[in-house]
Regions:
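Short beta-edge/loop segments at beta->alpha junctions of small alpha/beta modules
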Residues: 1-26, 62
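Short amphipathic alpha-helical segments, especially helix-boundary/capping motifs
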Residues: 6-12, 31, 68-73, 98-101
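Short, charged/polar surface micro-motifs in flexible loops or helix N-caps
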Residues: 11-15, 25-28, 40-41, 72-75
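A general structural signal for well-ordered alpha-helical packing
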Residues: 17, 31-32
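Short helix-capping and hinge/turn segments at secondary-structure transitions, especially at repeat
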Residues: 25, 36-43, 99, 103
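Short, well-structured alpha-helical patches and their helix-loop capping segments
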Residues: 26, 60, 86-90
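Exposed, interaction-prone assembly regions rather than primary DNA-binding/catalytic cores
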Residues: 32-83
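Hydrophobic alpha-helical interaction segments
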Residues: 79-145
Length: 145
């Protein structure tokens, strides 16, 4: 609660991504928000999607919905600082989305929107290097690994 009060009364207005990072730490922007940021999906999500290690939750603040999704500790990697906010790299955002589809927590139909983005060598290498065996098998339905 104190973090929220400090954030809302900061002298310099911060971006929505910074707000999402600040309210629950550690967290990084990923999934639909990062995919939209990188131009991989056309639509801009109405919520800000973040990855955390703790319990998944949604927070509504200043007419924004912040969605925090829990991921395994070993997958809490692959993010960089962009404009003062921690964000998944393009490859990691794709990985995260596929992981949450695999877990049944995201719709599979959006994969068709970004299937061309999955074909690059850098993306394939990231998926091969970071996915466990069962996740690789699932990803193999959409990407030639």
């Amino acid at each position: 609660m104190i973090r929220l009060i400090l954030f809302l009364h900061a002298a310099k207005p911060a971006s929505d991504f910074m707000m999402a990072n600040f309210l629950l730490f550690p967290s990084y922007i990923s999934l639909e928000s990062a995919l939209s940021y990188y131009g991989i999906i056309d639509q801009f999500p109405y919520h800000i999607s973040s990855i955390i290690l703790g319990k998944s939750r949604n927070i509504k603040i200043k007419n924004k919905v912040l969605t925090y999704s829990r991921i395994k500790k070993e997958y809490f990697t692959g993010f960089i600082k962009i404009d003062e906010a921690l964000m998944a790299t393009k490859e990691k955002a794709l990985f995260d989305y596929l992981y949450f589809v695999y877990k049944g927590l995201r719709p599979v139909n959006i994969i068709n929107d970004f299937k061309p983005s999955l074909q690059g060598k850098k993306v394939r290498d990231y998926l091969i290097e970071n996915a466990d065996t069962s996740l690789k098998k699932f990803i193999g339905r959409y990407v030639k690994l």
